[in-house]
Amino acid sequence: MAVCIAVIAKENYPLYIRSTPTENELKFHYMVHTSLDVVDEKISAMGKALVDQRELYLGLLYPTEDYKVYGYVTNSKVKFVMVVDSSNTALRDNEIRSMFRKLHNSYTDVMCNPFYNPGDRIQSRAFDTMVTSMMVQVC
């Protein structure tokens, strides 16, 4: 489904980035980094409405020829960015939304770990396994 999944801290540094295939890793890192400007624009456009809103899904941030970039923001302003292959036309908006909810739940589990210091890179096997299950297996 996804070819790159990133968790970005409130201060815009990466807590976790995973991409496949690895030969395009730098390209995906660039796409995630550039999408943060769009995330900030969407958050500021929503203004106070975002505080009252329970749904933090930002939707499609921007499409490219080969990929689509989607975003999600938590209440603590941690950003989730997902890059999806554009050729996968069967993937619907509600499926992307449920993938972000699953990612958010797993991130919450990481945050509840007493040995995790908020702001550190995420190095959880359970989180990594969940992200791997969302990634496309490219042959």
Curated annotation (Swiss-Prot):
Localization in the cell: Cytoplasm, Perinuclear region; Endoplasmic reticulum; Golgi apparatus
Chief location: cytoplasm
Record flagged with keyword Endoplasmic reticulum: yes
Pfam families the UniProt entry points to: Sedlin_N
GO biological process, one term: endoplasmic reticulum to Golgi vesicle-mediated transport
Gene Ontology CC terms: cytoplasm; endoplasmic reticulum; Golgi apparatus; nucleus; perinuclear region of cytoplasm; TRAPP complex
Keyword Plastid: no
Keyword set, alphabetical order: Cytoplasm, Endoplasmic reticulum, ER-Golgi transport, Golgi apparatus, Transport
Highest taxon above the source species: Eukaryota
Family: Belongs to the TRAPP small subunits family. Sedlin subfamily.
Biological role stated in the UniProt entry: May play a role in vesicular transport from endoplasmic reticulum to Golgi.
Self-association state and partner proteins as the record states: Component of the multisubunit TRAPP (transport protein particle) complex, which includes at least TRAPPC2, TRAPPC2L, TRAPPC3, TRAPPC3L, TRAPPC4, TRAPPC5, TRAPPC8, TRAPPC9, TRAPPC10, TRAPPC11 and TRAPPC12. Interacts with the heterodimer TRAPPC3-TRAPPC6A.
Protein name: Trafficking protein particle complex subunit 2-like protein
